[in-house]
């Protein structure tokens, strides 16, 4: 899993940038744009929340954002893709899986589930209790995020193809 940012591209030798720009930049850019643009608004809200972008970004197309916004977005997608990988889940209970998440990843999961700070601030081991009223929403959100990031492009890029040439 790789993220291409403008900073990484600028550090590459000029000849390498030209080759990547000529052969790889367009398909990588298109894959990243398609992946984000085809998300439902709720999924975009989750990714934008994790990237600490505003709600209005969830209604924008990927190509409409500026360099900084796109970079924050692809970095957030990459982090969430690593966190919500089905390979990480193998053999782990929901409780164990959630306990492996960082605080920011767990907060994003709770937000995606439509839960509030009140639920987030409760001990997450409560999901093992049948009386936990928010556990089903959390488990549903967990399955949704596994599904969302299962087919994310291998290489995400925030760099427009023409930026390789400058």
Curated annotation (Swiss-Prot):
Species classification: Viruses, Duplodnaviria, Heunggongvirae, Uroviricota, Caudoviricetes
GO biological process: DNA biosynthetic process; DNA replication
Protein's job: Required for lagging strand synthesis. Might interact with the host dnaB protein.
Annotated gene: B
Superkingdom of this protein's organism: Viruses
Key words, A-Z: DNA replication, DNA synthesis, Early protein
Protein name: Replication gene B protein
